[in-house]
Curated annotation (Swiss-Prot):
UniProt KW Cell membrane keyword: yes
Pfam family, one: OSCP
Subunit comment: F-type ATPases have 2 components, F(1) - the catalytic core - and F(0) - the membrane proton channel. F(1) has five subunits: alpha(3), beta(3), gamma(1), delta(1), epsilon(1). F(0) has three main subunits: a(1), b(2) and c(10-14). The alpha and beta chains form an alternating ring which encloses part of the gamma chain. F(1) is attached to F(0) by a central stalk formed by the gamma and epsilon chains, while a peripheral stalk is formed by the delta and b chains.
GO terms, molecular function: proton-transporting ATP synthase activity, rotational mechanism
Descriptive protein name: ATP synthase subunit delta
InterPro entries documented for this protein: ATP_synth_OSCP/delta_N_sf (IPR026015), ATPase_OSCP/dsu (IPR000711)
Membrane among keywords: yes
């Protein structure tokens, strides 16, 4: 997947430069919506059909998004360029990299929190507050539940992983005892 990331990076950076001249949040919404549409196998099938023109594919993509930016000339040019270069399948990766650029500009990061049990509002706020102090930046959490952790949480922020789960502690103890 590193190849996809390498190919998608210039598109994401160019789109981000365009977005800096306007509303970054609105562009983020547009690119996320386009990525969702591009994930649909039906759309990729239509896009690769020789019976459908490139202009029709671009119009289909833009018609499928709700964002008001979809009607703008810059958005149309971006989508048309992706269609012309056969890069529609890159939209999810472009969206991911666009979000990373947006987070970097805001001094924030996405945090994936996996807990053994569901976290209520107060527990989640307390956990996120502590994690923000540890990672020294604002975090945008996404929470999932995985009962196989037995207890505790596993937090992933960028390429850093903080695993305080019981399963990780048991694995660590097992490694220490068998070494």
């Amino acid at each position: 997947m590193a190849e996809l990331a390498t190919i998608a990076r210039p598109y994401a950076e160019a789109l981000f430069r365009v977005a800096e001249g306007g509303d970054i949040a609105a562009w983020s919404t547009l690119v996320q919506e386009l990525a969702q549409v591009a994930r649909l196998p039906e759309v990729l099938s239509v896009a690769s059909s020789p019976k459908v023109t490139r202009t029709q594919v671009a119009e289909l993509l833009l018609a499928a998004v709700k964002s008001p930016l979809g009607a703008g000339a810059e958005a149309k040019n971006f989508v048309q360029m992706l269609v012309d270069n056969h890069r529609i399948a890159l939209l999810p990766e472009i969206a991911e990299q666009f979000e990373a650029l947006k987070n970097e500009r805001e001094g924030a990061a996405d945090a994936e929190i996996v807990s053994a049990f569901p976290l209520n509002g107060a527990d989640l706020e307390s956990l996120v507050s502590g994690l923000e102090r540890k990672f020294k930046r604002k975090l945008k959490p996404t929470v999932a539940v995985d009962s196989s952790l037995i207890g505790g949480v596993r937090v992933t922020v960028g390429d850093e992983v903080l695993d305080t789960s019981v399963r990780a502690r048991l694995a660590s103890m097992q490694a220490a005892l068998t070494a």
